[in-house]
A protein has these predicted regions:
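Membrane-embedded alpha-helical signal segments
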Residues: 1-280, 294
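Core alpha-helical transmembrane segments of integral membrane proteins
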Residues: 261-325
């Protein structure tokens, strides 16, 4: 079933353990070489008299490693192997010994380029999901912090972690989210979180507002968890999805958590006013220019008195396209 000869990175290593033929299967690049060397070296000293009768006893007595399990279902074995774990088959055993000594190519947890902060920690999420969960677990050492792992995608089988505080989260929201996740049937999360977001909240009408807040900072995600929100982590993505969210959440920044209350309120109010001005100033300007009699005398100086060859609405559209093109 496994294309060992066709795929160069799928490795099969045959050895003899206690007089029984055995085979290691693992993916090159996903396994810690030094750990595998120590495990295989320990098997060379096993004699026939020391060989247990079952795979469970073998994993408990002879495998010198912490994360060890046994699997008998073929689909589960294939899924674990393709996820990076090492599978050991021993002649005469009905189950496979699964050794989780995998490692992933990963960069350092440096500060995010697009989500910097003047104060606070300088670490950020990376593309490896277990590193991201560890960064949040380090900040919230509470048994109520739940990180539920699931898989989405028939081909990709992408790991998705649902993180929440079970004593603070809205249970109805959590139930609705789990129900939506179970109904997702896609071949793969090609664009990771963006694909997941589109599958979670499908709408038949156009909504320009974002449905999630994204952050690449573990401290921001941890703060949202403590507020009772849900954080979704997707493997191969260096950002977290936060829900529920609102327009007020979109004008928050990481610096807000580290400034005094007065400064925090001032910055949020400033961003809110700027957001409102961005939405309403341009259409109001167009409205008053087309109806000068409505323009208050205080703002009479902004009136366009010269004749223009291009209508104002087209001027604004050209300006918008020029700004977007830069």
């Amino acid at each position: 079933v496994l294309p060992v000869k066709e795929s160069f990175d799928l490795v099969q290593r045959d050895i003899v353990i206690g007089g029984k033929k055995s085979s290691f299967f693992f993916i090159d690049g996903f396994t810690k070489d030094d750990t595998m060397l120590k495990i295989m070296t320990s098997f060379f000293s096993v004699t026939e008299e020391k060989m247990p009768d079952s795979a469970t006893e073998f994993s408990r007595l002879l495998v010198p490693y912490v994360e060890v399990d046994t699997l008998s279902e073929f689909d589960g074995i294939i899924k674990n192997l393709l996820s990076g774990t090492t599978c050991l088959f021993v002649d005469g055993y009905e189950a496979c010994i699964v050794i989780d000594c995998r490692t992933y190519p990963a960069r350092g947890v440096d500060e995010p380029y697009n989500d910097k902060s003047l104060r606070g920690p300088r670490d950020g999420f990376v593309e490896t999901i277990v590193f991201n969960t560890a960064l949040m677990r380090r900040r919230i050492r509470d048994p109520h912090l739940i990180m539920k792992m699931t898989e989405i995608g028939e081909s990709s089988r992408t790991d998705v972690a649902i993180c929440y505080m079970d004593d603070r989260v809205d249970q109805e929201l959590l139930k609705n989210l789990n129900s939506r996740l179970e109904k997702i049937h896609v071949d793969a999360l090609r664009m990771t979180q963006q694909t997941l977001a589109e599958e979670l909240f499908k709408r038949k009408w156009f909504n320009p507002f974002p449905k999630f807040k994204f952050t690449e900072r573990p401290d921001t995600a941890a703060s949202c968890l403590l507020e009772g929100k849900v954080v979704i982590l997707v493997d191969n993505s260096p950002s977290a999805m936060i829900l529920p969210t609102s327009i007020l959440d979109m004008i928050e920044e990481a610096n807000d958590y580290y400034f005094p209350t007065i400064t925090n309120v001032y910055l949020k109010v400033s961003r809110a006013l700027i957001t409102i001005a961005t939405v309403f100033v341009t259409p109001l300007f167009l409205l008053f220019m087309q109806n000068l009699e409505w323009l208050p005398e205080v703002f009479a100086f902004v009136a366009i008195k010269d004749t223009v060859n291009i209508p104002l609405i087209f001027q604004l559209l050209i300006l918008e396209l020029a700004i977007d093109g830069l």
